[in-house]
């Protein structure tokens, strides 16, 4: 008769249970292989994000309608930028099938990060929603909005150096602490991070682009310098992720047991997305700011020339009458 060790039996029974408990809950609902088609087939329109985006779009269009009724023309380009790559950009990564894979593939999460913190906020700023609201609102709500925009909290949070510090610290705080793993395990935290990325991007880019009348805006040289300082951010961040010897999120992604994705390869792709995408957006915005600076300098030069011409003409007229 073979002797059976009760301790070994207990260990063999307990081990799978412990493994199943520590494995991510998402493993029971692993999505199908990621393809272009799945971006559409895995979309979810029945979410609070969809409701929020539709509500914001409706308010914007209502403001445009009020201006049109009052005889004021609102640029169609601004409306297209706000609704298209602005709100549409947010929807493309939070409502489409990408949201199904944001806790499965780090690379998809990085696409979300880029869109929510850098791309969409730029086009939201170009849509000038605050300017639209100030023109469309009745006097009393307009005064309240101005009070909010110029409040101490708004001034402090949107001050360029403060906004720059938050913009720089945010990605490192997410990916180089336990926060990223926590967002993978808790959907509500994941949603809060998305909201924070949008807000941080708006606070950073809106004063730089200078479309809306926000407090604390710097002159063009200061804006260009601040944008220049942000260019290396995503290079350092992307390379750090690509060259990391540990997986971000710990054992979360390996424990999903995906047969169609390798966590290590996906992490390299994720770092490349941050590196390349961040560099492209930063350099593009820097070029736009330099262009604004040059046009502003040209306008100032023409103004000075006109003033000098008026003074010279006045002196000649005075000399002739004398």
Identify the role of each PLM range.
Residues 2-322:
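Alpha-helical membrane segments of multi-pass proteins
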